[in-house]
Amino acid sequence: MITIKKGLDLPIAGKPEQVIRDGNAVTEVAMLGEEYVGMRPSMKVREGDTVKKGQVLFEDKKNPGVVFTAPASGTVTAINRGAKRVLQSVVIRVGGNEQVTFEKYDVAALNQLTGEQVRRNLQASGLWTALRTRPFSKVPAIDAVPSSIFVNAMDSNPLAADPAVIINEYAEDFTNGLTVLTRLHDKVNLVKSAGSNITAVGAVKVHEFGGKHPAGLVGTHIHFIDPVSLTKTVWHLNYQDVIAIGKLFTTGELFVERVVSLAGPQVKNPRLVRTVSGANLTQLTENELNAGENRVISGSVLYGAKAEGPHNYLGRYALQVSVLAEDTEKEFFGWISPQANKFSITRTVLGHFGKKLFNFTTAENGGHRAMVPIGSYERVMPLDILPTLLLRDLEVGDTDSAQSLGCLELDEEDLALCTFVDPGKADYGSFLRQALDKIEKEG
């Protein structure tokens, strides 16, 4: 077992009850285009078209053969685009039960599948997009071969669901999905929390991690088990997509159900809810939130997307819906007050004393300023890198130095804690993405 000692378990109120219940019914779902790094869509549908579940909505021009399929049957009501015609979302009003079917196999035959059969079914169904590369966090090319595949069956994010609860609900499908992945590649790593009751198949290598967040991030697992470089790539996916793969290969149908944590200080009854991928989050959270102005987040409070407008939907890779109170009020002389109800990693407020949970809000508690290297980054970065030097290089755009310091191993979520503890309020995730895009383009 690998124990992570540096990091931070955010003491946030609103932790979910680890019991699965049905969420609100939704009548609208969407595919979010900006979730897919570097993707350029070739649209296969128009507004007003009727689509089946599993029907192709668009294909990646840069990565021919990678298709993105509808999570529900119904009518395409909007194709939203942003600046420079970037695809924001394809919105579907749910209606009917028609669906596209794919190849299916007996459970006993899964262990005899060829790699080509697995690729063909994943790509036709759109489940190929469950896989992402490291470095660069892109959907892999249809003929690419990784060094290994990582299945992340743990989650240390604040307010996260316990993966074991969900996996045990779909135990057979999870096992079948793992079997399929072993036919795609002979090196499959399953990572779970220490002592977690999750069963793997024989050909899968099991690893256990424990300790503070980011112990549950796949970037942490890759760093310690099979580090990547510019010439070495691994793939990863989450445990719910493994369940979906198991369902696909045994039923021939696209499985889009998601169990997400609906939690946070502003949620009346924090719990695990059953919904669908791409669900409209206004509908999912209706009558679930405390009064006042709230921010609904698709994903973790540390690294998630604000759900509003064209992005008001559950993300493809999101396993959480987090809700915080919007806080736009400026606190008069807040820096000099005792702040008994505020949290700080630097122990400069009274809120540090005693173990209690905090009602975090969207307030940044300060303005943007220059980097202040006081050791905060080192306290929350468990990877074998020099965080202050790396973050400095990312902020000034020195990609050569950033690459030598290990930025290729990282994704935006891996720097979320550094952003959280930064006195200068910089968004290091966006700096990292700019650097990765430049490195991929220029080498």
UniProtKB/Swiss-Prot annotation:
Known partners and oligomeric status: Composed of six subunits; NqrA, NqrB, NqrC, NqrD, NqrE and NqrF.
EC number(s) given by UniProt: 7.2.1.1
Pfam families assigned: NQRA_2nd, NQRA_N, NQRA_SLBB
InterPro entries tied to this protein: NqrA (IPR008703), NQRA_2nd (IPR056148), NqrA_C_domain (IPR022615), NQRA_N (IPR056147)
Family: Belongs to the NqrA family.
NCBIfam families: nqrA (TIGR01936), PRK05352.1-2 (NF003759)
GO MF annotation terms: oxidoreductase activity, acting on NAD(P)H, quinone or similar compound as acceptor
UniProt key word Ion transport: yes
Function: NQR complex catalyzes the reduction of ubiquinone-1 to ubiquinol by two successive reactions, coupled with the transport of Na(+) ions from the cytoplasm to the periplasm. NqrA to NqrE are probably involved in the second step, the conversion of ubisemiquinone to ubiquinol.
Superkingdom of source: Bacteria
HAMAP family: NqrA
The protein, known as: Na(+)-translocating NADH-quinone reductase subunit A
Assigned keywords, A-Z: Ion transport, NAD, Sodium, Sodium transport, Translocase, Transport, Ubiquinone
Reaction it catalyzes: a ubiquinone + n Na(+)(in) + NADH + H(+) = a ubiquinol + n Na(+)(out) + NAD(+)
BP terms from Gene Ontology: sodium ion transport
